[in-house]
A protein has these predicted regions:
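Mg2+-dependent phosphoryl-transfer active-site scaffold
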Residues: 3-167, 173
Length: 173
């Protein structure tokens, strides 16, 4: 209800976020986050959720936040490693921001069941190298069986593994 009523229609609220006037707003009050808000100029609740998810050392240090902002503002083209990733990553302008996206990518590209995708997500989050290595092989084989380029699939797996070092599920963000 809150999402539907306040954040769809309250332009003044969004203006406060766009101006970085978020002192006292949990998760949005640090000076770094206020800088990001001023640059990103959020216009919808999904923008705020993505920014909160991406405001972590990994994405900040890797340039993912800058990519998200540039793509959101149309200053940079949204690029997907494979066309099948567009429906999974469109809401975040081609940037992996949530654990659910890792699971969907595993399912879409490699044919993982949701159970297997969750095993991969957990292994990545807990840095269980032995499980990740086994799942990497299954991911690459599954992607190849579906006609995907193995090198692209490997790059995508590495992106997912990198993401797992900082990622949360969407509802946590």
């Amino acid at each position: 209800e809150f999402r539907r009523v306040l954040f769809r229609s309250d332009a003044r609220t969004y203006q406060l976020f766009q101006d970085g006037q978020t002192n006292g707003v949990f998760q949005f009050e640090s000076s770094g986050m206020r800088d990001i808000l001023r640059k990103a100029r959020p216009q919808r609740l999904d923008d705020l959720i993505a920014l909160n998810a991406l405001y972590r050392p990994g994405p900040l240090g890797s340039g993912m936040v800058d990519d998200y902002i540039a793509r959101k503002q149309g200053k940079s083209e949204v690029v997907y490693e494979m066309p099948e990733l567009e429906p999974v990553l469109a809401d975040t302008y081609g940037v992996i921001a949530y654990q659910e996206q890792v699971m969907r990518i595993s399912s879409v590209l490699a044919g993982f069941s949701l159970g297997d995708a969750d095993i991969l997500r957990k292994a990545m989050g807990k840095k269980q190298e032995d499980v990740m290595e086994k799942m990497r092989g299954r991911f690459l084989d599954g992607a190849a069986e579906r006609g995907h380029d193995r090198d692209k699939a490997r790059r995508i797996f590495e992106l997912m593994a990198y993401f797992a070092g900082y990622g949360f599920n969407k509802s946590h963000s």
